[in-house]
Amino acid sequence: MPYDPAISEPRWQEAWEQADTFRAVRDERPKYYVLEMFPYPSGRIHMGHVRNYTMGDVVARFKRAQGFSVLHPMGWDAFGMPAENAAMEQGGHPRDWTYGNIATMRGQLKPLGLSIDWSREFATCDDAYVAQQQALFLDMLEAGLITRKSAQVNWDPVDMTVLANEQVIDGKGWRSGATVERKELTQWFFKISDYSDELLSALDGLEGWPEKVRLMQANWIGKSRGLQFRFHTVDLPDFPTIEVYTTRPDTLMGASFVALSPDHPLVKALAASDPKVAAFVEECRRIGTTEEAIETAPKMGFDTGLTVRHPLDADWRLPIWIANFVLMDYGTGAIFGSPAHDERDHEFATKYGLPIRATFGERGMDLEQADALVAKAPFVPLKSETVTYVRGFAGAADQTGEAAVDAAIRHAEVAGYGEGVTKFRLRDWGISRQRYWGCPIPVVHCDACGTVPEAKANLPVLLPQDVSFEVPGNPLNRHPTWAATTCPKCGGPARRETDTMDTFVDSSWYYARFTSPHAATPTDRPETDYWMNVDQYIGGIEHAILHLLYSRFFARAMVKTGHLPESAKEPFDALFTQGMVTHEIYMTRDERGRPVYHLPEDVVDGKLADGTPVEVIPSAKMSKSKKNVVDPVNIVEGFGADTARWFMLSDSPPERDVEWTAAGAEAANRFLARVWRLADEIPEDGADPDLTRAAHRAIDEVTRAIEGFAFNKAVAKIYELANAIAKSGAGGESRREALRIMAQLMAPMVPHLAEEIWMKAGGQGMVVDATWPKADPALLVSDSVVLPIQINGKRRAEIEVPKDMPKDQIEAIVLADETVRRFMEGQAPKKLIVVPGRIVNVVV
């Protein structure tokens, strides 16, 4: 009888649900918390979800079988712009759109057979989650972790909201794609910069994280050691000095200009009285705001006509320019340009005809040679490289850049014109968003008392339901009554804060809430102390900076406010970043050469129905616009969930991209059908010690593969075991034992089929409740050994022989081997050396 997943899979899912199999329980067992990054409720799951949650499910089921009390929850990252966009485009309300999508996606995820404790499910837009996030905000405010200040912010003119630096990609808003502008607003900030040094130094302890992610975070935090010093201005009594921070003070003798940010206080003063300066500043605002956008934009400058004195020579004047590449929120908003040793400064100096003077050259160069070296391009060696300083002022003539920087800092401190300081690139996290569909910020503004935290007794502060999205901007600002409230301090009239929180706040502590999702406080410490930390976190590399850095900060904030134990300062013990699921793109071109994309089902043998050949682009990221998206619902309905899971695990290492192909899915389906037949047709008699040995080797190898996140290797070992069962003459209990072992090894990956095989092979209860098998060490020791054969120093063949075979018998087998005879070409061996258990050398 053929295996029918449409019947089997729902039956086992119902059995697990009725038994409450996956409810996480705090008991005497060791705990294991596995968490995949929770999804945004877009309305449809995609193959990336299937891969991500299948990997997490393998780990959860495996650990459960090993005797751990496993927490494997699911929730929804539910606030955000798409719901408002849907309300604007389709009518309706963001809440209805969001909860409708959650219901749809829950219905799509459950048929995958994931071992999730659904009793812990929540959405970040739930009233209960909003209440506890607001309580957490108030605790953080009281602890001094939140501040409100006027600041230059990234303004998305399409979404009409503020973006954090991390949410600006190539100068554009991460959701809208609009060019971001710089604007000054009063904002709420989390003081993440207070933790810069700790967040950086603690990265070394995250041994379970990919090195790439740790490096990305370290670069983002951006610790640097440099010199902060003062240029004295000429004839500017209101601004007698300009403060500058540099990481290369050793190049000070190569300075040719000072450049100010368009947002520098001196520039603002100049713009107030000079329309040309004001116009240039406005032009700068239109090119983007982030370091990345500014680095790639054409370098623009405005000569103010003002000058400063060089700190090493009072008679040496440097011009003051305004430059679009100088950022106000890093350093001091002012730099000195050393064009000889900086690509950006060289480009600027060349464009505006400013001097280019070498500070150092290649080792052994004189001043004239060094100046010639940098005339056309900057000389930027590694700081660890020794160079010759031709315009040096501190330290030896021949020294490394590192030594020269230290010497320059010491020189400045002794001379009194500067101090050595450490700075970080990481800025405070601005969380104010001018949107409706987000968590309200629980503060009020009172004319008498100022800005006042809402009383906890009044939480949650919920969003009004009667809002309109017919015009851009924040509906909360336009609502006739919602903002009007009472001051919790004096009882007088007050106005609610109409900004809502950045949605990254919601996902920065959800892992902690899963430990006690129904608690009347942000966490329930006995539960949280038991379950935290997350033992294995799984998600995309694209979250390396935003989500993961914010979560590390939030964990520290929750420790400080008493909601997490000290041991949870780093919330994720291990992190795995999976690859994408890709698919071929099928494309033709129209009469103007523009691409026209086609659905996979419209292409047969490389052609459309009308015979038009298509271009095939392999391994492309799935994209609705390019019509190469595969719907998991169709795969589950057509092949079953186990086939989708098996394919996702089998095709490539999980950290790499996997290409979904129909042929691959069909092959996975055929293998599972073959496994079913092995269990459906069990001979009555016969034992086979080799099969028992193969089963125990499979236990050992699959266990190590799953523990090492090498799921594709685990799949390969199960293929080998299935082949061993098929070839074996064993029947009866010998075969059933091998099948039960195979069912247990497959259970984390294809749990429904594993239950069927377990049942057919005489397993007790359900395989999901069975203890993970242990390999018998005696059966892992092979009675034979493979010996490579080298002929004249080159490996040409190998033979498998019993471990205790005498040398003379091995020699006879070697000389009789067809491959060996071919390479010997009829010659007698001069030497034949057998190294027992290792190698055979033949010299002819």
Curated annotation (Swiss-Prot):
One of its GO terms (biological process) is leucyl-tRNA aminoacylation. A motif ('HIGH' region) lies at residues 39-49. The keyword Ligase applies. GO terms for molecular function: aminoacyl-tRNA deacylase activity; ATP binding; leucine-tRNA ligase activity. Disulfide bonds: none annotated. Keywords: Aminoacyl-tRNA synthetase, ATP-binding, Cytoplasm, Ligase, Nucleotide-binding, Protein biosynthesis. It is an enzyme of class 6 (ligase). A motif ('KMSKS' region) lies at residues 621-625. Its EC number is 6.1.1.4. It is found in: Cytoplasm. The keyword Transmembrane does not apply. One of its GO terms (cellular component) is cytosol. ATP binds at K624. Signal peptide: none annotated. It catalyses: tRNA(Leu) + L-leucine + ATP = L-leucyl-tRNA(Leu) + AMP + diphosphate. PANTHER family: LEUCINE--TRNA LIGASE, MITOCHONDRIAL (PTHR43740:SF2), LEUCYL-TRNA SYNTHETASE (PTHR43740). NCBIfam families: leuS_bact (TIGR00396). Belongs to the class-I aminoacyl-tRNA synthetase family. This is Leucine--tRNA ligase. The lineage of its organism: Bacteria, Pseudomonadati, Pseudomonadota, Alphaproteobacteria, Rhodobacterales.
